[in-house]
Amino acid sequence: MPKPVILCIDDQREVLAALIKDLDPLAEWFDIVDAESAEDAGAVLDDMIDRGVPVALIVSDHVMPGVTGVQFLTQIRERGDLPHTRKLLLTGLATHDDTIRAINEAAVDRYIAKPWHADQLLDVVGRLITGYVLEVYPDSYQQFLPVLNRDVMVERMQQGPGPHGDR
């Protein structure tokens, strides 16, 4: 089974480098992949889907040339071929309308303002990937235990089987 992927998208190479560095503690369990535009990210996702590579999380900047992060994440939701993939939006320049669209149209799971703190990013990502892992790998989640968020796991155990709002 290929490792699930965390796809990071930002048009600024230094921001991508910081994201990859901050997410490095997860690299034993997840492949961290980057793209510098929504167009590149779309091609990466198409390739992963064709190869059967699971995509756990998309971390996208909002303000990018061409297609914004909200527009891209809306396209991902509308595609329908990544139903379990979690979505995290990063931005320092979102308007109130952007935030509403991110929630209502793109079904973004979380939002983090730039600049972020590494521990904040890892906490949010940990919560999102825990929900993903418990949903997609219910019988083999133990292999991910070192990086799963314990609070989310306890909440899930208390809720019992069935659909959950852990996003």
Please place each PLM-identified region on the residue numbering:
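Two-component/phosphorelay signaling modules centered on CheY-like receiver
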Residues: 4, 13-37
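Active-site residues of response regulator receiver
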Residues: 9-10, 61, 91
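Helix N-cap/capping motif at the beta->alpha junctions
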Residues: 34-47, 69
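Active-site beta3 strand of CheY-like receiver
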Residues: 49-59
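Receiver (REC) domain active-site loop signature in two-component systems and cognate sites
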Residues: 64-65
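Alpha4 helix (beta4-alpha4-beta5 surface) of REC/receiver domains from two-component response regulators
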Residues: 71, 94-110
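C-terminal output helix
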Residues: 115-125, 129
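CheY-like receiver
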Residues: 130-167
